[in-house]
Regions:
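Glycine/tyrosine- and acidic-biased, solvent-exposed loop/turn segments at the edges of beta-strands
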Residues: 1-71
Length: 71
């Protein structure tokens, strides 16, 4: 499930993705339908598992978190 901004039918701007259980999966920025800019990924149970930056859908700056502790 996606909640956020669209431009010309593509995800663009700030948005959030959710798992089927309703928990947040990703929150961050999109450009031309792809993750682009700052974002956070969460596991199925709501724990942060990645925080960093994306470029054209790829991770380019990574801060990985295990058990909610940034490493």
């Amino acid at each position: 499930i996606f909640e956020g901004e669209y431009l010309n039918g593509k995800r663009n701007g700030k948005g959030k993705e959710y798992y089927d259980n309703g928990n947040l999966k990703f929150e961050g920025e999109y450009k031309n339908g792809k993750r682009n800019g700052k974002g956070k990924e969460y596991d199925y149970f709501g724990n942060i598992r990645f925080e960093g930056e994306y470029l054209n859908g790829d991770r380019v700056l990574v801060h990985i978190s295990f058990n909610n502790k940034i490493k």
